């Protein structure tokens, strides 16, 4: 899918603000002391630089922290973009700040995952469409004040009808006042809060999409656009129409409505969990249904239930039992633009109708599957709207197809699983995938398994942010590389994964010139010994002005990939893998891995501590190619470096015919190991050594190829 035109490149938000203020104050104090101290201050600065391994290594090749970067003006000679993000600029302009910035960003993501509302705000901010609802005032309290007794749910539904105000809107059920009045306040109030938030969401959606002429057609074409991103058979006219429409959307308005619903959802799930745990006898056989312009409201008690695929609900609340879902929590049409599913307890199964016939449990759901379009979103998947799925407990099974399990195009899609040992399977654009929108997958605890083929597990396409945040547990992340259905341009024997922290853009400079800058993809795992597998493009990787981040906080982890993996980037991207604690094993089999940047890109692998093993290919461990910057830094531990190729351990190659502009532009490979007794397969590298390496074209060397390694 991504074409790389080269022949050789085979903490909490408040805490973050306080930390930033302290850092600024500290730097200001240092500058003041240096200014006042005169010559002795200069000497103090020199000694400080000598103690900095980064500065010490760079000095060996005539660089400083200030000059070791991709010059944006140089980059602009070759690349064009739209939707370029400020996060990309910040990291590209000063890549050696990555060890300071990325851990804070990952910590903020993890803190935000305690609240669906906070996570929605966090994701929006990454793509310059963040709306800080609740920064001043309490959003939920505002909705609570609007509850009108004695029949608050009826009033909320009436407000939703008014907000929808469509010519084809269904009429209010005649018996609804009696039905809603019969519900106790402990149930009616949380339902009413969500319906009120949905009514406001409709208004924000109308503002966001007011320049879109036909949302029904766009709904179907947006799904086809996503499904065809790795196909040469995609209709060019459809592509132009979807991308034109995406440029008309007001993403600030779009995310405003989603954020309100997310914040109300955080409050509602607490109330519903309290209600379910009360053990009230009437909960067991509870059953309530009513129509709304956006789909049905369905509420069931603690008995097991089956939710048929023909449903396109606005809201499903299930208070317990081992349930089977073939629908719910996903938008099914432009008119079903908001869908919320809350399951309070039970070992539940969420099975996309397209996946029902390949269920592996021995049962068959084909009879219930019906004729639902197999490409439509499912279970936290949104198109042109909002989808939320909250599962509060149990060992659950998720089986999707496309746009599932926290994914969105032109919308916001969220999956939040509170606890349990869960399994999630999907095909493409799932498990934290944002494309012209926000896709968020949160799993707070449990030993979980994630399986996808492509575009998932923290994937951000154009104007999109994809987040997969896992709180704790020994987890397994797989981007399938054995069943080859997306053969990569780099190696047909492997899939193009685009998974596990990937920011990805549309490169069209060699097609029609209409390139689009990539988004932000983040996979953040807090605790546990985890295993990661992917093919090509994954594990902290980016392409075409995207930002891809994989951050793992602790555990003895295993990383397995092929090409453009483990802190690498191609063509104007920033890719980072940050592992904080544990004895880890990194394996990459072919090329461009473990701190490698290609073509005005930055690739960075930072491992903070542990006795680690690196099985590295060519262009790795601090490999710069085609004016890219590759940085590798293992800070502590007794490490082992198994390498046989030449372009590794701090080496750079401009990889272009001599005499062009690229000869005058920096290409850097930087390797750092700053602690422990290490083992190297290369004789020139070793404990306590510093080394430099020339570019591979020794007959025509250029001074802008800088390669250096340092072991302390």
Describe each PLM feature range.
Residues 2-4, 19-302:
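Terminal non-domain segments
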Residues 303-306, 313, 321-326, 331-332, ...:
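Extracellular beta-strand scaffolds
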Residues 351-380, 431-432, 456-459, 478-514, ...:
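Acidic/polar low-complexity surface segments
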Residues 670-712:
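Leucine-rich solenoid repeat scaffolds
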């Amino acid at each position: 899918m991504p074409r790389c035109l080269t022949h050789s490149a085979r903490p909490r938000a408040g805490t973050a603000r306080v930390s930033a203020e302290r850092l600024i104050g500290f730097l200001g104090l240092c500058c003041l002391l240096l200014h006042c101290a005169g010559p002795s201050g200069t000497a103090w600065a020199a000694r400080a630089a000598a103690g900095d391994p980064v500065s010490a290594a760079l000095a060996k090749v005539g660089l400083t922290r200030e000059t070791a970067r991709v010059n944006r003006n140089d980059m602009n000679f070759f690349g064009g973009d739209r939707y370029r993000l400020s996060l990309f600029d910040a990291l590209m302009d000063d890549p050696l700040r990555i060890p300071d910035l990325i851990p804070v960003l990952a910590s903020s993501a993890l803190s935000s995952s305690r609240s669906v509302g906070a996570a929605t705000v966090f994701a929006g901010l990454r793509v310059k469409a963040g709306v800080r609802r609740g920064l001043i005032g309490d959003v939920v309290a505002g909705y609570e004040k609007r509850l009108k007794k004695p029949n608050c749910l009826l009033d909320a539904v009436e407000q939703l009808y008014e907000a929808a105000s469509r010519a084809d809107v269904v009429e209010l059920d005649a018996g609804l006042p009696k039905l809603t009045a019969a519900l106790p306040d402990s149930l009616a109030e949380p339902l009413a809060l969500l319906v009120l938030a949905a009514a406001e969401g409709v208004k924000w959606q109308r503002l966001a999409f007011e320049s879109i002429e036909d949302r029904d057609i766009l709904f179907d074409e947006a799904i086809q656009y996503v499904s065809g991103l790795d196909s040469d058979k995609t209709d060019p006219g459809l592509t132009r129409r979807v991308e034109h429409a995406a440029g008309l959307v007001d993403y600030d308005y779009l995310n405003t409505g989603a954020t309100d619903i997310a914040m109300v959802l955080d409050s509602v799930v607490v109330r519903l969990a309290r209600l379910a745990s009360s053990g009230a006898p009437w909960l067991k056989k509870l059953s309530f249904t009513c129509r709304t312009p956006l789909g049905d409201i369905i509420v069931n008690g603690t008995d097991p239930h089956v939710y048929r695929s023909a449903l396109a609900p606005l809201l499903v609340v299930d208070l317990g039992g081992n349930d089977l879902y073939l629908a719910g929590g996903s938008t099914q049409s432009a008119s079903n633009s908001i869908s919320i599913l809350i399951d309070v307890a039970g070992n539940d199964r969420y099975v996309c109708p397209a996946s029902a016939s390949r269920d592996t449990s021995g049962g068959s759901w084909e009879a219930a599957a019906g004729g639902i379009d197999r490409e439509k979103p499912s279970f936290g998947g949104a198109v042109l709207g909002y989808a939320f799925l909250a599962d509060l407990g149990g060992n659950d099974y998720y089986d999707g197809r496309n746009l599932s399990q926290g994914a969105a195009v032109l919308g916001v899609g969220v999956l939040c699983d509170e606890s349990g040992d869960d399994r999630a399977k999907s095909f493409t654009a799932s498990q934290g995938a944002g494309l012209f929108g926000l896709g968020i997958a949160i799993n707070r605890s449990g030993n979980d398994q994630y399986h996808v083929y492509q575009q998932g597990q923290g994937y951000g396409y154009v104007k999109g942010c994809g987040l997969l945040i896992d709180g704790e547990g020994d987890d397994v992340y797989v981007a399938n590389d054995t069943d080859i259905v997306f053969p990569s341009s780099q190696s047909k024997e492997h899939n193009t994964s685009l998974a596990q922290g990937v920011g990805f853009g549309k490169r069209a400079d060699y097609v029609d010139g209409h390139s689009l800058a990539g988004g932000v993809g983040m996979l953040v795992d807090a605790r546990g010994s985890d295993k990661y597998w992917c093919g090509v493009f994954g594990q902290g990787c980016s392409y075409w002005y995207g930002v891809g981040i994989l951050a793992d906080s602790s555990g003895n982890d295993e990383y397995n990939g092929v090409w453009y993996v483990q802190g690498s980037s191609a063509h104007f991207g920033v890719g980072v893998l940050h592992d904080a604690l544990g004895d880890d094993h990194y394996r990459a089999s072919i090329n461009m891995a473990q701190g490698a940047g290609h073509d005005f890109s930055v690739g960075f692998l930072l491992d903070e501590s542990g006795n680690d093993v690196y099985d590295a290919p060519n262009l790795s461990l601090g490999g710069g190619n085609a004016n890219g910057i590759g940085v590798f830094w293992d800070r502590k531990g007794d490490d082992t470096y198994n390498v046989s190729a030449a372009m590794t351990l701090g080496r750079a190659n401009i990889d272009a015919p001599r005499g062009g502009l690229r000869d005058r532009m920096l290409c850097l490979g930087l390797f750092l190991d700053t602690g422990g007794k290490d083992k190297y397969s290369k004789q020139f590298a070793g404990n306590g050594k510093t080394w430099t390496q020339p570019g591979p074209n020794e007959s025509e060397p250029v001074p802008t190829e800088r390669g250096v390694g340092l072991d302390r």
